[in-house]
């Protein structure tokens, strides 16, 4: 039995050694697969992190851009508001001139207008009371008709009218006035 026992022990030892080799090989392959999976996961995580950072940067940039545009709109709106106030103030100053200054401006405007001998000047009720005699003395025909204008006049030649009221002049020259006011105020 001695030989048989030795042979059995040897078979068992060989089997244990072979089993250990198989286990070591399997463990080595498993470690390789785990390491490979970890590397892949880290690469994907880095990729997702970069992507998330890029998306966050894009969102932040979009937010900043939106805020910048909103600020520009508010600034532009405020500038427009200031310009409108300047134009309104200019119109009010024209309307609140002393009588002799207002009269002089109206006379200068009439001289520069296309007023001829066959035309007549239409004024507001207020201006007709204060300017009719002055204009008549200068040989300017004042119409019996009045218009609802706050300042200035209308030149009437038959059926054709040329509107020199302050409202009409400001409306026509609004863009030019805005440009000048903007240069003065914002440069």
UniProtKB/Swiss-Prot annotation:
Signal peptide: none annotated. InterPro entries: ATPase_E_C, ATPase_V1_Esu. GO terms for molecular function: ATP binding; proton-transporting ATP synthase activity, rotational mechanism; proton-transporting ATPase activity, rotational mechanism. GO terms for cellular component: proton-transporting two-sector ATPase complex, catalytic domain. GO terms for biological process: proton motive force-driven plasma membrane ATP synthesis. It holds the Pfam family vATP-synt_E. Keywords: ATP synthesis, Hydrogen ion transport, Ion transport, Transport. The keyword DNA-binding does not apply. Belongs to the V-ATPase E subunit family. Produces ATP from ADP in the presence of a proton gradient across the membrane. This is V-type ATP synthase subunit E.
């Amino acid at each position: 039995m001695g030989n048989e026992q030795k042979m059995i022990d040897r078979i068992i030892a060989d089997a244990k050694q072979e089993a250990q080799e198989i286990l070591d090989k399997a463990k080595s392959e498993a470690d390789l697969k785990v390491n490979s999976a970890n590397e892949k996961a880290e690469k994907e995580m880095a990729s997702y992190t970069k992507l998330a950072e890029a998306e966050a940067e894009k969102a932040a940039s979009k937010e900043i851009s939106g805020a910048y545009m909103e600020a520009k709109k508010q600034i532009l709106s405020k500038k427009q508001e200031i310009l409108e106030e300047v134009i309104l103030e200019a119109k009010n100053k024209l309307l609140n001139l002393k009588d002799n200054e207002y009269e002089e401006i109206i006379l200068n405007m009439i001289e520069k207008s296309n007023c001829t001998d066959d035309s007549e000047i239409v004024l507001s009720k207020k201006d007709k009371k204060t300017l009719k005699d002055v204009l008549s003395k200068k040989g300017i025909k004042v119409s019996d008709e009045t218009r609802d204008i706050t300042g200035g006049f209308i030149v009437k030649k038959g059926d054709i009218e040329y509107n020199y009221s302050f409202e009409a002049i400001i409306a026509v020259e609004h863009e030019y006035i805005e440009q000048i006011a903007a240069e003065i105020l914002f440069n």
